[in-house]
C-alpha cells in the first residue's frame, strides 16, 4: 500500500505526544517524498509538524473534537478560540476523534474525503493472547501497573477476552481499548447506509453490525 498504487495518499496525525515524530523520520517517507499528504489535528506536536514539512508532506488541518460542548469550559471551545487559519476564514473542519487516530481516520475518510467504502487496516483495538499481562495492563507502558487478582470478576470485566468469529481468533481488551472500540462501532452503526466499513485487519475486536470482514488481499482485489 503505497502512493504509487494510491495516488491520493493521506496519513493522519492527531496525538500531541512527542513520540509521533518517529512516523515522519522514516526512510519510507523519504522514498515517497512529495507524494504523501498529511491531515493533522490542530493539537499535533509542533516538532512532528515541522519534521513532516521537511519530509515533503503537504499538510491539511482539522480541529479535533475531544469532549462534549459545555460552553466556555469545554476544551473544544477553548482550543477553537486558540486556533487561527488564514486560509479558512470560516474556521477549520471539526471532526470527532474517538480518542485515537484510527477512529479519526475513519471519520476523515467519510466526512472529509467523501469515501463510500472505508477499510480498516491494523486497527485491532485489543491485545493478542501472546501479549504479556504487563503490556496489556499498562496499555503498553502508558499506564501504571496495578496488582489485581486475575481470577476476580472485576479483572475479567476490565480485561475481557473476546472471540472474533469473523477471523476465528481471540483478543483481550483493556479499559482504553473498550472505550475506543465501543465508540468506533457506534459511529459505524449510526453512519449513513451507503457508507460501507470493511475490517481488513485480520484480527482484533472490531466486528459486528455493519462491519464486513475480509483479508486485506481480498479487499485489494475486490476494490481495486
Predicted features by range, described:
Residues 1-224:
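Metal-ion/cofactor- or nucleotide/acyl-coenzyme-handling active-site neighborhoods
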Amino acid at each position: 500500500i503505497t502512493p504509487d498504487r494510491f495516488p491520493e495518499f493521506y496519513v493522519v496525525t492527531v496525538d500531541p505526544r512527542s513520540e509521533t515524530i518517529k512516523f515522519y523520520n522514516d526512510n519510507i517517507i523519504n522514498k515517497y517524498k512529495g507524494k504523501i499528504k498529511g491531515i493533522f489535528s490542530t493539537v499535533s506536536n509542533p516538532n512532528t509538524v515541522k519534521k513532516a514539512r521537511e519530509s515533503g508532506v503537504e499538510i491539511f488541518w482539522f480541529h479535533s473534537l475531544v469532549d462534549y460542548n459545555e460552553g466556555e469550559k469545554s476544551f473544544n471551545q477553548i482550543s477553537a478560540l486558540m486556533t487561527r487559519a488564514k486560509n479558512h476564514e470560516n474556521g477549520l473542519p471539526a471532526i470527532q476523534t474517538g480518542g485515537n487516530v484510527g477512529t479519526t481516520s475513519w471519520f476523515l475518510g467519510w466526512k472529509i474525503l467523501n469515501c463510500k467504502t472505508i477499510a480498516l487496516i491494523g486497527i485491532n483495538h485489543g491485545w493478542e493472547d501472546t501479549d504479556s499481562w504487563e503490556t496489556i495492563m499498562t496499555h503498553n507502558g502508558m499506564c501504571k501497573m496495578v496488582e489485581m487478582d486475575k481470577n476476580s470478576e472485576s479483572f475479567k470485566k476490565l480485561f475481557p477476552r473476546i472471540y472474533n468469529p469473523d477471523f476465528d481468533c481471540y483478543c483481550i481488551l483493556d479499559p482504553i481499548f473498550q472505550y475506543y472500540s465501543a465508540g468506533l462501532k457506534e459511529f459505524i452503526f449510526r453512519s449513513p447506509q451507503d457508507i460501507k466499513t470493511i475490517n481488513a485487519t485480520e484480527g482484533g475486536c472490531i466486528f459486528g453490525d455493519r462491519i464486513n470482514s475480509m483479508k486485506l488481499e481480498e479487499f485489494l482485489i475486490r476494490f481495486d
